[in-house]
Amino acid sequence: MKTFKEFTSTTTPVSTITEATLTSEVIKANKGREGKPMISLVDGEEIKGTVYLGDGWSAKKDGATIVISPAEETALFKAKHISAAHLKIIAKNLL
């Protein structure tokens, strides 16, 4: 059994979670799922109403609007040019 001093002196390295690491985890979890519902990092299940576009981006229908956003759903506003392939995935799965 450890003494209090031994227990409190042991530190476990904690990695810093950044937008880049979160994006890479989203990309890893959804690899090969372009055109299919995204996989949640929380519970590993498909997120209904979403379509994974690839490169860490997703689309979802919000009423009559299609929202394209970073898959990690950050609060930052971002702009990104999407490719014709992304538009084909959106048209096939959301329209």
From Swiss-Prot:
Q: Where is this site: Cleavage?
A: E19, A20
Propeptide cleavage-removed residue intervals: 1-19
Q: Which GO terms describe its molecular function?
A: type IV site-specific deoxyribonuclease activity
Q: What's the protein name?
A: Internal protein I
User: A Pfam family name for this chain?
Assistant: IPI_T4
Recorded source organism is: Enterobacteria phage T4
User: Gene3D superfamilies from the xrefs?
Assistant: 3.30.160.860, Ipi1, C-terminal domain
Q: What does this protein do?
A: Internal protein I is one of four proteins in a complex that functions in bacteriophage head maturation.
Q: Which residues form a coiled coil?
A: none
Identify the InterPro entries for this entry: Phage_T4_IpI, Phage_T4_IpI_C_sf
